[in-house]
Regions:
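Glycine-rich flavin
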Residues: 2-5, 21-28, 32-183
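N-terminal Rossmann-like FAD-binding beta1-loop-alpha1 element of flavoenzymes
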Residues: 7-32, 196-201
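Hydrophobic residues in beta-strands of the RecA-like P-loop NTPase core, especially within AAA+ ATPase
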Residues: 10, 33, 153, 189-190
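Acidic, glycine-rich active-site loops and adjacent beta-strand->loop/helix elements
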Residues: 13, 36-38, 193
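Rossmann-like NAD(P)H-binding beta-loop-alpha module
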Residues: 181-201
Length: 201
């Protein structure tokens, strides 16, 4: 038997989770369907922006800016720091901690506002009795949800380039670039969106 809601939001990124919370605050029974899994294979709300986009790139950018300030700017303030080193593992650990805290914060807001959260890939499959039918697949399991209103907030994915395989070794997507454990000597960035520009920084 299908679970029934007033509003179903497909996508748990910044557009989706905010819409779901607001719908619930306005008194609609609301569910958010999201398929994202973190590198450990666990569901993680927040979409590309939080998990493999704007937030982690800003965290790493801040670490890089701090390193640059120690190397080049602190002396102007009368602060001398010797033997400054980069610990990329620690930088990545900090970045991952920021992601985890923010994802947990979204889950808390869902609970506080009574937004149901279903993990899996949501797909509109039709209408029945004035309601939209949504099939949610997670691994080998499928369930059905019905909702009077549907908000599609599925975000984006990196665009594949013809004849170029993303192996996350030499050719990286945003997720691979944000997990690099060594600083590359050279890096070419294709794309001038927010993530691309921050990678170039």
């Amino acid at each position: 038997m299908s679970q029934s809601f007033d509003v179903a939001v497909i996508g748990g990124g910044p557009g989706g989770y905010v819409a779901a919370i607001r719908a619930a605050q306005l008194g609609f029974s609301t569910v958010c369907v999201d398929a994202f899994k973190n590198p450990q294979g666990k569901p993680s709300l927040g979409g590309t922006c939080l998990n493999v986009g704007c937030i982690p790139s800003k965290a790493l950018l801040q670490s890089s800016e701090n390193y640059h300030a120690v190397q080049h700017d602190f002396a102007d303030h009368g602060i001398t720091v010797a033997n400054t080193q980069i610990d990329i593992g620690k930088m990545l650990e900090r970045k991952n901690g920021i992601i985890s805290k923010n994802a947990a914060g979204i889950a808390f807001l869902f609970k506080k506002n009574k937004v149901a959260n279903v993990h899996g890939l949501g797909k509109l499959v039709g209408r029945q009795n004035e309601k939209w039918l949504i099939e949610v697949t997670d691994g080998g399991e499928t369930q059905q949800i019905e909702a009077t209103h549907v908000i599609v907030a599925t975000g984006s994915n990196p665009r594949p380039l013809p004849g170029v395989e993303v192996d996350n070794v030499r050719v990286l997507d945003n997720a691979g670039a944000l997990a690099l454990d060594q600083i590359p000597a050279r890096l070419g960035v294709i794309g001038a969106g927010v993530i691309g520009l921050e990678m170039g920084s």
